[in-house]
């Protein structure tokens, strides 16, 4: 019985460390901007999908939830937050829909079956990222008005960057899924 409790404790500690590491990775990916035209690219959506693909939907969603919670309480984890953070005010701003979309995208990416061909993996990752942008546009339209050019503001500038990130993750996906065996 003690062995079972010890193994369960080790598993909980391992999950906890993965979630903390994922949250740190998300924060770093939000803060580092890669020059890209017309809008600088972060690797945030890549990390969101990476967490789901590598560790499954439970750890992926838990990691994103922790990250969002950190931002809501005022830690400067989001892409545009100042050093002192601004919490709920920033969270409910123009990017809230995208941030909520991270949860659903990580969930879908975590449910991927990687025994299929590369085209199918690519398609599922496109679906995952599409959820982020759909929720982002819905919130943005609600916030700034539906009469604004929402696609030009909230989607089009990021399409090439997303295609790059999805392509990279598609190539890595079959290797990353092997990490699930260790958790």
Q: Model regions: which residues?
A:
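Interfacial aromatic-anchored transmembrane helix boundaries in multi-pass membrane proteins
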Residues: 30-40, 68-105
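Juxtamembrane membrane-interface segments at transmembrane alpha-helix termini
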Residues: 52-54, 58-59, 74-80, 137, ...
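Hydrophobic transmembrane alpha-helices
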Residues: 1-61
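Membrane-embedded alpha-helical hairpins and interfacial helices in multi-pass inner-membrane proteins
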Residues: 115-183
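Structural signal for the C-terminal ends of transmembrane alpha-helices
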Residues: 54-58, 108-115, 175-180
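Alpha-helical transmembrane segments in multi-pass membrane proteins
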Residues: 18-26, 48, 52, 66-71, ...
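Helix-loop junctions at the membrane-solvent interface of multi-pass transporters
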Residues: 28, 32, 54, 81, ...
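Residue-level signature of transmembrane alpha-helical entry/exit and packing/kink sites
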Residues: 11-19, 45-48, 59-60, 90, ...
